């Protein structure tokens, strides 16, 4: 197992929290391997480096990075963590008993947190407990990594969405989703279809949160490109989500399916009007 850990010294730990939270950042790829999780010469990948540095700079958390779930994603080792974060692809070789423990006792009952980033939605396609937890499954990306897109923020009060303002333009690869469950999630940001060139419009969520039993789940679709990881607003957004999961900042996770329905309807109307 290659578990990368950068430990902050006791003096660096936040006084208010008593001790820093711990995050297990899983960057293993069983499908497509993104450049942002690609380790070179035994060094941390770009996304792992950013998460590790964010933890130290914020005094909020410490990160262990793994690309070996068989070794590091076990019932025994999960006891050490407050949040699990996935930037993964494919069917990860996590033992069934460890998966069951993670979904049920660790996340739902103990009230820990899960953060999925970008291709976390391109993981365990045919495994319902996973997509039921995360909220949706990768269904292609009509907008490739070079696409410049406009994103609308729907809930600027939530700490994960607040850093972005009301609307912003960014260059990144954008996923669309199947197994989408609007009745279970709160969409914080979505693709602005009126400003997007696409013949088949629909609602494309970008950032959402949900309660999962007593646990909290956040999925951030952005993060394909390495320059997104070094974007300060993106980092603040992840930090806001972490603070929300840890209960340090309030944010609403009430599902807003009516927003998804309205966005879908508006996207179709905008497209028809443009023709």
Can you describe what each PLM-predicted range is?
Residues 1-5:
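Bacterial N-terminal signal peptides
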Residues 11-20, 27, 47-50, 57, ...:
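Extracellular ligand-binding/catalytic regions of CAZymes and related secreted enzymes
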Residues 23-26, 78-124, 214:
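Short alpha-beta junction capping motif
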Residues 29-32, 69-72, 89-93, 114, ...:
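Solvent-exposed loop/turn segments at secondary-structure junctions
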Residues 30-48:
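Glycine- and acidic-residue-enriched helix-capping/strand-helix junction motifs
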Residues 48-52, 99-104, 127, 238:
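Extracytoplasmic/secreted envelope proteins and their assembly/folding machinery
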Residues 58-73:
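A short, well-structured beta->alpha microelement
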Residues 136, 144-214:
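Catalytic beta-strand/loop cores that center a nucleophilic Ser/Cys/Thr
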């Amino acid at each position: 197992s290659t578990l990368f850990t950068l430990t902050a010294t006791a003096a660096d730990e936040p006084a208010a929290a008593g001790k820093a939270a711990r995050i297990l950042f899983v960057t293993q790829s069983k499908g497509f391997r993104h450049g942002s999780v690609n380790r070179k010469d035994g060094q941390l990948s770009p996304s792992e480096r950013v998460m590790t540095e964010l933890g130290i700079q914020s005094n909020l958390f410490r990160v262990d990075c793994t690309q070996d779930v068989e070794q590091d994603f076990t019932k025994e080792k999960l006891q050490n963590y407050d949040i699990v974060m996935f930037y993964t692809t494919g069917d990860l070789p996590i033992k069934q008993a460890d998966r069951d423990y993670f979904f049920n006792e660790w996340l739902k009952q103990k009230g820990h947190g899960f953060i999925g980033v970008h291709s976390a939605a391109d993981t365990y396609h045919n495994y319902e407990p996973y997509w039921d937890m995360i909220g949706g499954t990768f269904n292609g990306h009509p907008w490739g990594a070079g696409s410049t897109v406009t994103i609308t923020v729907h809930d600027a009060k939530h700490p994960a969405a607040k850093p972005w303002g009301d609307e912003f333009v960014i260059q990144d690869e954008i996923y669309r989703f199947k197994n989408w469950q609007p009745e279970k999630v709160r969409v914080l940001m979505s693709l602005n279809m009126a400003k997007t060139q696409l013949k088949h419009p629909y609602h494309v969520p970008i950032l959402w949160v949900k309660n999962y039993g007593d646990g909290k789940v956040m999925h951030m679709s952005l993060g394909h490109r390495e320059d997104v990881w070094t974007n300060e607003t993106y980092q603040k957004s992840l930090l806001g989500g972490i603070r929300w999961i840890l209960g340090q900042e309030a944010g609403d996770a009430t599902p807003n399916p009516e927003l998804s329905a309205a966005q879908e309807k508006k996207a179709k109307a905008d497209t028809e009007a443009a023709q």
